[in-house]
Each structure stands twice: as C-alpha cells, then as structure tokens.
Amino acid sequence: MSPVSAIPLAYKLCLPRSLISSSRELNPLHITIPNLGMCRRGKSMAPASMSMILTAAVSDDDRVQRRRGNYHSNLWDDDFIQSLSTPYGEPSYRESAERLKGEIKKMFRSMSKEDEELITPLNDLIQRLWMVDSVERLGIDRHFKNEIKSALDYVYSYWNEKGIGCGRDSVVADLNSTALGFRTLRLHGYNVSSEVLKVFEDQNGQFACSPSKTEGEIRSALNLYRASLIAFPGEKVMEDAEIFSSRYLKEAVQKIPDCSLSQEIAYALEYGWHTNMPRLEARNYMDVFGHPSSPWLKKNKTQYMDGEKLLELAKLEFNIFHSLQQEELQYISRWWKDSGLPKLAFSRHRHVEYYTLGSCIATDPKHRAFRLGFVKTCHLNTVLDDIYDTFGTMDEIELFTEAVRRWDPSETESLPDYMKGVYMVLYEALTEMAQEAEKTQGRDTLNYARKAWEIYLDSYIQEAKWIASGYLPTFQEYFENGKISSAYRAAALTPILTLDVPLPEYILKGIDFPSRFNDLASSFLRLRGDTRCYKADRARGEEASCISCYMKDNPGSTEEDALNHINSMINEIIKELNWELLRPDSNIPMPARKHAFDITRALHHLYKYRDGFSVATKETKSLVSRMVLEPVTL
C-alpha cells in the first residue's frame, strides 16, 4: 500500500456508461472465503481462519471473484459540501486586512528607530525575534518578507559563537534569545552553528534552566526544544538539547496552571516540527496568542509589538482563506462526483481529507493549482493502490500498466470497463496538470511526469508478483521497491511543477528522482507508513512490511526490535531532510524545497496516531472540521 494516495487534475471525466448505468455494472456479491488473504503491500496469504468479503464482477460471459479492502465510505456528502457558505469572501474583510498589513509594516519599520522606552540596545534583538516568530507562527509572514529579512539581517549582524542576549549591548548571552535566534536564523538560511548551544550546556547534558522552573526559564526550555528539532546529521548538542528540554517541559507543564504557556508547550510536544503544518500551527497559535494570560497582548514597556493587531490580521487572513477553501473544496467534490469514481465502491474516497492536507501545506491563495493538483494526484494514487492491491487481477493490472506505458486512449479496448474509466481519468489528469505546469515552467512536462507514473506502477507490479508467488522479500528488497510504491514522487512532482518558480530539468532533478531529497522523503513515508499500518495489514493477512522483512533478516528479533530499528532510521532521515531543506549550497528555489518538505510533514501528520487515511473517522475528521469547515471567531 502507498502511504500517499491520489487522483488527477480533470473535471469532466466520466467512467464508461457500462460501468455507471448498464446491466454490466459491477454488482457486489458478498461471500465468506476462509482461506484467502487481502494483500495490499506485497503480502502472503492469510491463515485459514481469515474471512474475506469478495465482490464478483459480473458480466454476460465472465465471473471474477475480487477481494475488497472493506474500507469505510466517503464521510463528506457532496450535497453537504455544496451547501457550505461563508461571508469572509466579501471585500470589506479584505479591506480590513489590507489596513492591518500596512499598520504592521509600520511596526516593523519603527523597530529600526530606537525608542528610549520600547526599543533599546538592551532589547533590540529579542524584540525583532519575537516579531518575526509571531508573524510566522500566526501564518501571516508571507505579507512581510522584506521586513522579516531586514529584522533578521540586523540580528545576524550581532550574532556570535557565544550566543546573544536580549540586546546588542547585553553583557551576558541568555539561552532564550540564543535558542530562538538560532532556530529562526537557521530556518531562514543564515549560517549559524549549533555549537553555540554548548555555551549553555554542562558536562552532564544539562542546560541553563534551573529546577525552580520560573516562567522565563520554562520559555527558554521551550525555545531550546523548538530549536533542537531543526537538527542536522551529527549534531550531538542538538540531541542533548532535545532530550533535556522535552523532559524539562513535560515536568513543567504538570506544575503550571492552564494558560497560554501551558497550551504552547502542549502543542510543541505533541506536534514538534515534522508532524506540523503551517495552517495547523497558525490555527493553534491564535488560541495561544489570544489567551487571557498571553503576554503578547499585554501592553508594557518591554513588549513593543501590538499583539492585538497581529492577532486580528491572523484571524482575518485565516477566514478569508477559509472562504477560498470552501470554493475549491466544492470544485473538488463536484469533480469527484462527476468523474464517476464514486461508482468504484471497492476504493477509498478521501478527496476531502487530501484537500485539507493540501490547503494546510500551500496557504498562499495564488497556489490554487498546487492544492487541486495535490488532491487529484493523491486521490488517483489511492484508486490505483486499491486496484493493484485488492480489486484487480494480475492479468488486469499488467494490462493497465502496459496501457499507461503506451499512453494512447484508443488502445484500451483490452481493459475491463472499470479500468477504462480509471485510465481516462489518469490520462486527462496528467495532461491537464502538464498544461498547468507549462504556464509556470514554459515547457511541456507531460513526458517527464508520465515516466514517474510508469515507474510507480512498476513498483506495484513487483509487489503483486511477490503476492502471487507467496514470496516474503528481504528488508532491502522490500524497502527499495517500497520507497517507490510509497507514492511520494507521484504525489509531489506534478503539483510542485505548478508553483510560480522556474524548475529547469537539471534543477528539478535535485529534488525529484533520483535525488537525495526524493530518496529521503520516500524512505520516510515508507517507514512511517509501515510502522502505523503493519498490525492492521497483518490482521488481514498482509505479511510483508518493513517490520516483518526486518524480522526475517534477523532471526530471533522481535517486533519491538524491528520498530526500534526503524524508528532510529526515521530519526536520522528527519535530520537529513532538515539538511536537504536548508543546505546553503542548494540551487533549488526555496518555495519548491519547502513545499516538497511540507508534503512529508503533512503525510507524517496523517500517520501520527494511526493510518489516518484508511481510518479517517477520528483525528483526520477533526482536522478537516478545524482546518477547512470552521472559521475562527473574530
């Protein structure tokens, strides 16, 4: 099974009439078969006690028994989606937002004009860092790119290997200013070394936070924790910082009352960096920022920025984008319904969930093509996943793979009707996405994308062959093929090509296959997906996973041993992904790198607690409601 799942960028695509309305429509025939297993990832047969729901594909001259995943149906009725409405698309809200943007830009500019009461040589660094950190976490930073750069250039001009204090004339460096400065500067591409944190570490791995846990020391530990998650490979001090700060914060949050700081800590410990998403963080930080105990809304001589204006703009921006989300979601729901894909009852239909992820990644309104392309790509991947892993026969999936390789709709007569429809959806989707990409790239990228999908489908064929032969591969065999079948490349490539940044092929290969970035992202999704799905898969008779293959290679090892090994691999991959995102010698435009990186974060979020895609009735349903369906209260 692929941890990513997908469908393309077409609107008026319909499955063949024979599938939708004729007497040859697939009719489900529920049969209990005790000796057959459902295999989605290249698994062996189930034990004799395994019960299975099969669907018989009935035609005049053919009767094929087919396996079904028995997934729950789509949770979001099209009538409900089309009924959504919001007032936040009205011009008056945009006018208010524009006014606030101007006022906040004045706040940034005023920081360069020192005020004896508000901005002094003893607080000028931390004031700038607070301001930048706040607009970024509130999700409004895209409006202040120049102001952010100016503020960080100023901070960096006073940066040194012994850390910084609150201001340029501070006599002693402090952990809070240094940790926040290090994190912010590193994320913006400045050359800062993690060695600066050693200034605050003793020989026992303890950092400069006393056991008394005052509010100031707790905030220092929080910023140390946030900084530690942006680690590169080999940075021992970052490992020490994460261990110390996470333990310190877990103890502290038990002792302090419910307040903005406790909420901030709880969120940081829960989602960290690699299961976080820009829009999710913005929604949470509005609650933290606007809490009655929040220091950001208190007007005093040490707090320069007008927190109320920042919060007001953040809420307006969230709701204005929310109105755009509803329009796009209504389009996606119509597209899904009109395509005929709902007739494929055997497949998972998670277009709404995928739209939620896509809009949590790409929060700039102008990136509509990315959001819609991501949804369609991911949904099509899901349909193909369910065809190749459960519903389709070996003969059918080989025919389909060959049809994709030929790329000619006139040569699909050998396909069963349901596959003809899916093929046409794929064909039209990739064609339309290539047309969208041509607007930004200035060249035809269709053949490039097609090759990526051919390789992806070949990986499914390999897994199907393992199923048919009952072969349990070695860890390395499974992992190398599984990186491709994770579908990261298929899901990420075409949406990224629609971004408004030039990606000539020689640069594109630095983020696409066979780049280190692509290999790491695909590895990450395969490993994380397997750790969340292997028990449910095994219960359905699907044996092959990173866990089972590791245990095969290491006789006598336990599931716990395998999970420890895989989680260790994931931790190292995360650090390498950080480096690939932030490395100073990269020639890949940061918007492309960041969106590719955020796709891994979004999908990691989906697998944080469970397979949140196959089981979308719990945390994923709540995410949809909070991120897409519900505005914030102004």
UniProtKB/Swiss-Prot annotation:
A motif (DDXXD motif) lies at residues 385-389. It catalyses: (2E)-geranyl diphosphate = (4S)-limonene + diphosphate. GO terms for cellular component: chloroplast. Mg(2+) 2 binds at residues 385, 389. It comes from the Eukaryota. Belongs to the terpene synthase family. Tpsb subfamily. This is (-)-limonene synthase, chloroplastic.
